[in-house]
Each structure stands twice: as C-alpha cells, then as structure tokens.
C-alpha cells in the first residue's frame, strides 16, 4: 500500500518511491476526486484537476501506462430531460456548468481527452450517483443521497418533488463493468456513460 496525495507533485511521494511505482505500474484506475457539492471550483480544483494532471504525468513517466478514468455524468448540465450521449462534445456545455464539483470534473475530463488525443491509452467512464452494493447493501454512509434517505427515514417524511428521480447505480455493477472494459484495448479512447 502506498499513501499519497493527489494534490501534491509526485502524489507527495519521495522521488525513489514515485520512480519505483512508475517503473512497475502498467495500469492506473483513476477514480479519486474531491466531492463536495457546496464548495466552489477553487476549492475542488487542487485534488480533482491537479490530481488528474498528476495522474497523466505519472502515466507518461518512465513508460506509458493505461489509464481508466472515472469521470461523472455531472459533466453534463442538469435541469432538463435532454439525453446526453457518449459522443456529445462536452465543450458545448462549458458555459452551462454549475457548481465547483461539476466544473472540476468537466476540466479533468478535458485534460484526459487531450492526453488521449496525444496517444495516452485512456478509457473514460461517466457514472451517475454511485449507490449501494446490490448483494451486501453496503453503501457510502456520507453520500448525499444516502444522507437524504436517512434524514427522510428519521423524520418520517420526504420532499414533495415529483420530477426528482433518485438514480443510484450499484457500485458492484460499475466495478464489474469498468474492470471488464479495462481488459480490452479496443476500448481505449472511448467514453462510456454508466447508469443502470
């Protein structure tokens, strides 16, 4: 186990440790981000955008590594029923991004896309809200939707919001899909919207 910090150069690792990782790692699953829906972009940027920059540097250091990048469907603007597809040009949404988290994920995905165009083997995944494990029921206790459900159960009522859909894709479904896709080089350079 290696403990690092995405917001730091070389993940905050000493040079020897970083070099050893760079020489021995062939595949990177990048799913780290700062998740706080109330923070502005400036507070989310160091870990989400800076961290993505560090992952790209790492993937190019000493030898090329494949990157499986977990983005978010938050890179699409909300508020309507428009279906967004994998091949939508996200540059079309740049001026409609709201919230620091969504803005940072949009920028991070752009960085990954440009790295892919320069030859880095990358596959991108855009999950929606990641929910419980479909078998064990284990869930992130600090996820905002989990907290809303807990609050509703505790107080015995729920918001009246007829158009509010609680979309939660089971974490085990996502993990299985991402690892299966990662095994096939024909998926490099592709984007997958992943909502079950």
Where are the predicted features?
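Glycine/proline-rich active-site loop of Rossmann-fold NAD(P)-dependent oxidoreductases
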Residues: 133-145, 180-192
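Conserved beta-loop-beta element that borders a ligand/cofactor-binding pocket
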Residues: 109-137
